[in-house]
């Protein structure tokens, strides 16, 4: 199945010249020598909800436009990986791949994130109930279990 990673789409948009100009205006400390320091930007927006909203309001419409473009050029079942769905569940069948907070924290630690950054990031997100309300929930214990759950969902819904 084709998979679209919206974090990658977002990063591509953030690295554009239009985004650089926007970031220089709104988040000047996150721009160094015409390059975006993503750690600095993340630190800014995950510590200030208003600044996160400013970034999302700039970025999300562009991400949605790019997503629609990619989908229009594709056929069949497409998986879209989304970390911040912002109403996408209204347009698509939504599988929520859910892991408990302690599991998410452990995974982020293994990726080298500091505990304060992890806490700030998690605290800026919607709570578990909101995520669970978005669609069909698959509990993410490990990859083998996840693949099995996805296969079951696809078979039940005749999407294979």
Feature locations, PLM:
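Small-molecule kinase domains that catalyze NTP-dependent phosphoryl transfer to phosphate-bearing small molecules
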Residues: 67, 110-160
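A conserved segment at the C-terminal end of the G1
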Residues: 1-5
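Conserved nucleotide-binding/hydrolysis micro-motifs of P-loop NTPases
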Residues: 9, 100-104, 143
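ATP-dependent small-molecule kinase phosphotransfer cores
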Residues: 8-75
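Short, hinge-like loop/turn segments at secondary-structure boundaries
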Residues: 19-24, 95-96, 114
């Amino acid at each position: 199945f084709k998979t679209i990673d919206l974090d990658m789409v977002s990063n591509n948009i953030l690295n554009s010249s239009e985004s650089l100009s926007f970031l220089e205006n709104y988040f000047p400390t996150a721009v160094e020598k015409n390059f975006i320091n993503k750690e600095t930007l993340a630190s800014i927006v995950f510590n200030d909800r208003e600044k996160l909203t400013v970034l999302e309001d700039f970025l999300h419409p562009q991400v949605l436009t790019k997503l629609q473009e990619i989908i229009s050029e594709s056929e069949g079942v497409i998986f879209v990986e989304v970390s911040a769905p912002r109403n996408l569940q209204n347009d698509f069948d939504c599988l929520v791949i859910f892991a408990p907070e302690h599991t998410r924290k452990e995974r982020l630690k293994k990726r080298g994130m500091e505990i304060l950054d992890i806490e700030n990031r998690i605290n800026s997100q919607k709570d578990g109930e909101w995520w669970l309300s978005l669609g069909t929930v698959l509990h993410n214990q490990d990859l083998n279990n996840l693949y099995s759950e996805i296969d079951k969902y696809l078979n039940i819904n005749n999407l294979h």
